[in-house]
Amino acid sequence: MRLSALLALASKATLSPHYRYGMSRPGSIADKRKNPPWSRRRPVVVEPISDEDWHLFCGDMVEILEGKDAGKQGKVVQVVRQRNWVVLEGLNTHYRYIGRTKDHRGTMIPSEAPLLHHQVKLVDPVDRKPTEIQWRFTEAGERVRVSTRSGRIIPKPEFPRADGIVPETWTDGPKDTSVEDALERTYVPRLKTLEEDVMEAMGIQETRRFKKIYWY
């Protein structure tokens, strides 16, 4: 884990009470365009699912159960937990225009639309068919996903972050700051100024006398 991961926690965008989550990252330009500070959008009702019960992650192979691409399998490339959405690579697409101006109609590109969590199912690695899963614990105490049909463990995939790093396989390099060094307390606040601290550390005695200052 690098120092940038810790700094990212402090740079999270502050969201308003009327904020509505979407496909764009909170705080990005596209997100600010859809959620201006003065907007009062109607709240969206979302089925409450705890983090312990959520079982879909980026990199999972799933099969679509509903819609025009029902029966097709694809890889999860984005998860929006606040809306119970998953986005599959190249599936459930619609077309939209980008770069539209007054004189140019823009360029039409395909865009993946999100699917609700109950519209997809994980693919069993044994027979490549959709299956229900249960959370269980191994003998080592690790919490894993288990297929209810075959009993096979479905491991959580190693999926890179937005910066291309896979946290499970990352090893610190010579120029990376470790978590222990980043969290180590090395600064002790004092009432002295920087100049006074330097003089005390170097054994410098102040022999000059300040001139008197008069206020009128």
Swiss-Prot record:
GO cellular component: mitochondrial large ribosomal subunit; mitochondrion
SMART domains: KOW
Entry's Gene Ontology BP terms: translation
PROSITE patterns: RIBOSOMAL_L24 (PS01108)
Gene Ontology terms, MF aspect: RNA binding; structural constituent of ribosome
Transit pept. (range): 1-9
InterPro entries from the UniProt entry: KOW, Rib_uL2_dom2, Ribosomal_uL24, Ribosomal_uL24_CS, Ribosomal_uL24_KOW, Translation_prot_SH3-like_sf
Entry keyword Ribonucleoprotein: yes
Primary localisation category: mitochondrion
Positions bearing Phosphoserine: S24
Keyword terms of this UniProt record: Mitochondrion, Phosphoprotein, Ribonucleoprotein, Ribosomal protein, Transit peptide
Compartment(s) where it occurs, according to its Swiss-Prot or TrEMBL record: Mitochondrion
Domain KOW: 56-89
Similarity annotation: Belongs to the universal ribosomal protein uL24 family.
Subunit structure: Component of the mitochondrial ribosome large subunit (39S) which comprises a 16S rRNA and about 50 distinct proteins.
PANTHER family reported for this sequence: MITOCHONDRIAL RIBOSOMAL PROTEIN L24 (PTHR12903)
Descriptive protein name: Large ribosomal subunit protein uL24m
The organism of origin for this protein: Rattus norvegicus
Gene for this chain: Mrpl24
